[in-house]
Amino acid sequence: MKTISRQAYADMFGPTTGDRLRLADTELFLEIEQDFTTYGEEVKFGGGKVIRDGMGQSQVVSAECVDVLITNAIIIDHWGIVKADIGIKDGRITGIGKAGNPDVQPNVDIVIGPGTEVVAGEGKIITAGGVDTHIHFICPQQAEEGLISGVTTFIGGGTGPVAGTNATTVTPGIWNMHRMLEAVDELPINVGLFGKGCVSQPEAIREQIEAGAIGLKIHEDWGATPMAIHNCLNVADEMDVQVAIHSDTLNEGGFYEETVKAIAGRVIHVFHTEGAGGGHAPDVIKSVGEPNILPASTNPTMPYTINTVDEHLDMLMVCHHLDPSIPEDVAFAESRIRRETIAAEDILHDMGAISVMSSDSQAMGRVGEVVMRTWQCAHKMKLQRGSLAGDTAENDNNRIKRYIAKYTINPALAHGIAHEVGSIEKGKLADIVLWDPAFFGVKPALIMKGGMVAYAPMGDINAAIPTPQPVHYRPMYACLGKAKYQTSMIFMSKAGIDAGVPEKLGLQSLIGRVEGCRKVTKASMIHNSYVPHIELEPQTYIVKADGVPLVCEPATELPMAQRYFLF
């Protein structure tokens, strides 16, 4: 049998089993665990290549072949790090394996035909589009920024650049919910909107869920009282939606213990669990140790650097409508910034104790930096804590799977939409991000929504080829016309769908139903299910997990930073 060197093979068809790649300029290295393609039968498009009539391309009609094929790609997902061809049909992933022409090739499980378009995945990394569960819908342009960072699903709330939305992720009431659903119908991104859960009687909550909300948000700026928490969770259990909470920083309605008592063992998604973004000061970080709580971070504190503390005070004053001339407002802001808990947050992520990463877009966080900051934290933790259990000097596969789950499958599980998005798996929407390894986590090579290209770096439009400078991200055809309705999804509760909200509002996007999110627990959080016993020293703010102090130094330098943004 003829053989070629590993280097020559990688240059032609991309790396294979046992090959290693560095992620961007980090100290993280992946190793390909399995190659689903067949040596000697690989398919590749181009002049003199395999995907031609009678060779890699069969004679079947469109109904019998995939619409889009990604060839020889390296998949990073919670379930593995593998090389495979990926088949897409009707906007969904239908195959992960070996593509080709079954008439002349063995082991083919993805059929290429005349109706198949090809995306060259050789040497590229493939990830699922990110799911950001902490979006303040302050401006519609966030969708573009999120997409070009690799995020394809927004969950949050708001109505535009007004005080309520600048501070809270809430779309309150039927009228606001309906107008925002009509608005986001035009965005080329998946969307779910939170209703307001800050009310002590059930009727005003039920009507928001029936109006099309994906779930509910409790926020201290609207009142995160024990009664509101108890009532909101009662309705959520009844109607199978998730509740997200930004708890009571000032401890006015009760302390951390009262909030836990009101939650009463029911599932709830706690935002910015460290506390700088809000929540019981200083105890909210203890929620990492509750088996029914799904803990999340927002990206302004991630990872802990020498600049993190200094930049937070001004951000807080703006986001929460505070007045620097009022001493009580300044004290409120200062109570939330604790370098000790910020340092502990990085370590809790690395231990798999904090399960989700999100942005807090334009409300302290940066909508386009969820992916980047996740991997910066992983890099920092490898340098400071060494390899994770199960990893070797050769690869960081376990750490990579842990961190990618934080912004893909786990937020999807938390909000009952993992049957539609959150991973590269058969049957799910083909929301797929392609990366050159050198630019992984920073600048995608291609962003696909529902199997179509939504955004891509594109050169001079008047050039003879696509690559001449200036190159920048531009919207592609999945963003245009009626195509955007067939490639993006609006998520809402079963109650909203049964009430006919999509039909009443004339929504044209795909409609996704929330399901099963009241059964999710911390144990459901893939690679991030650790439930430590958390202690916090109230004077020093030192955090302990199972008796071990969580202490680390701030980073003075990070990868995936200035060298990628010179132009």
UniProtKB/Swiss-Prot annotation:
It is an enzyme of class 3 (hydrolase). Its cofactor is Ni cation. The modification N6-carboxylysine is found at residue 217. Pfam families: Amidohydro_1, Urease_alpha. Carboxylation allows a single lysine to coordinate two nickel ions. This is Urease subunit alpha. InterPro entries: Amidohydro-rel, Metal-dep_hydrolase_composite, Metal_Hydrolase, Urease_alpha_N_dom, Urease_alpha_subunit, Urease_AS, Urease_asu, Urease_asu_c. Ni(2+) 2 binds at residues 217, 246, 272.
